[in-house]
Amino acid sequence: MTEYESAQKGALKLKGCGDMSLGKKKKKKNKANDQIMQEIITSKKNEEEKKKPSLDKRTPAQLAFEKMQEKRQMERILKKASKTHKQRVEDFNRHLDTLTEHYDIPKVSWTK
């Protein structure tokens, strides 16, 4: 029996766990991190306020290109907004009617 007397009796214990049988470990709040984050946020706001408006370094061709792009985009938006969904579906069905039977697909219903 002397060989078995040195054996541990009872529940096994994990290393580094200590007496934490009640549940999860509580997280510590780091006040220094909170202060640092607040300082970073305020410094970014101050930098944005201090920034001078930068000069426009685009060439006349680039300006004209962007102006035409905006104009075309507005035309596309107005064109799409001018038709209702029902009108678009009817136009699509008319287009399908003109195609040959090779491309035959059922008509689209505007009610669904």
Swiss-Prot record:
Cellular component, GO annotation: nucleus
Protein family per UniProt: Belongs to the FAM32 family.
Main location: nucleus
Region span, Disordered: 15-35
This protein's UniProt keywords: Apoptosis, Cell cycle, Nucleus
Cross-referenced InterPro entries: FAM32A
Purpose: May induce G2 arrest and apoptosis. May also increase cell sensitivity to apoptotic stimuli.
GO biological process terms held by the UniProt record: apoptotic process
Protein name, entry field: Protein FAM32A
Disulfide bonds: none
Top-level taxon: Eukaryota
Organism listed in the record: Xenopus tropicalis (Western clawed frog)
Residues that span the membrane, as ranges: none
Keyword ATP-binding: no
Location(s), subcellular: Nucleus
